[in-house]
């Protein structure tokens, strides 16, 4: 018995030394030396129409024929987040911080605060003109902001606009009035900024939906929040002859990065829609880009020119726990893109949130833990799903690690090895979304950012191996 116990202890120590996670082992949520901790939220898609009491708080009343489901239970798969789901997510991150004696230095939200079909449901279930809808949309966004602020008082929040976060409809450019209202609300959550920096960021947001602010925890480091919806493929003219620089955002980004570089600083980019391939839609037919290819080319050129200035990119939009490797102009790996899972379960994923470790000297992501609410259970509760370093055996999710991990995934399958693990994490634990038939769509999308390179990756994978 003693010999067996000793062998078990040796095995545990060996696995621990390799940074691997034992089944069901809780993550050690403590700052590593030289790190701080932050919270990452994405794709909340809050649905106020699900609750008549919430609608009343927002000054609206549902018409007959638009029954609210109430606020007693979590939404089902295929639905957006209601009040109980969002509150439970925030309660979880607060409780986790208290239990582990950690402090969030800031919160990043990668966009899509508002539910899908937000505008059409307003017309159907409430009614009213453009001005009334603009107020309702901005008030709903402020309601979500208020829930975050109430849960995490005093913690700075840096958020990007999602494609649904508009008073003009999905992917539509928001009105100036909407941007002004949201900007005033968000600017109050940016923490202790110099008055000039706050005013400049608020003015930039009101003008174009983007802004840059100093990182409250890392010296000489900037958060640059982009309105990447302007570059999305839904806007077919974006970066073309008739609209070469939508909203002047590339000029603005170059100016900001130039200022950061001259100061010897660094930056983190935050956006909603990421560049690259839409893996889900590409698996149903022809390859499709998330941005126009012209905007993608300009973005790659911009970041290549400022190599070493941008240290990290955070994005959302696809409602999955994943990553991308952004190439430079020569096609060589340049930067990691960290993609946060969604809180909304509308695409049949479990709700997820992430707690991250950042480097206090560079601002780079050092590690992260994903937490999930398993809606397949009769009485769902939030649980720790995995920590990157323990799950994959890489010390940090940097460019080198993700290059290796993407290769391991590419050579694996959803039923074995690291591929099986990643496939489960991809949908935050809901089951077999990834299959051998669609595997290469999702694997090639991690490393190939253009339609041509994506197609070549799939063709190469389809050839018989020698």
Language-model features and meaning:
Residues 47-50, 115-118, 159-170, 232-234, ...:
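Active-site environment of divalent metal-dependent phosphoester hydrolases
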Residues 8-19:
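Bacterial N-terminal signal peptides
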Residues 40-42, 105-112, 153-162, 268-272, ...:
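Active-site neighborhood of phospho(di)ester-bond hydrolases with catalytic His/Asp-centered motifs
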Residues 62-68, 75-172:
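Core catalytic region of metal-dependent phosphoesterases/phosphodiesterases
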Residues 1-9:
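Bacterial N-terminal signal peptides that target proteins for export
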Residues 233-250, 258-310:
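Active-site-proximal segments of metal-dependent phosphoesterases and phosphodiesterases across multiple
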Residues 130-149, 179-200, 291-300:
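Acidic, His- and aromatic-enriched active-site or binding-groove loops in soluble protein domains
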Residues 22-109, 179-236, 240-263, 305, ...:
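Metal-dependent phosphoesterase/phosphodiesterase active-site architecture
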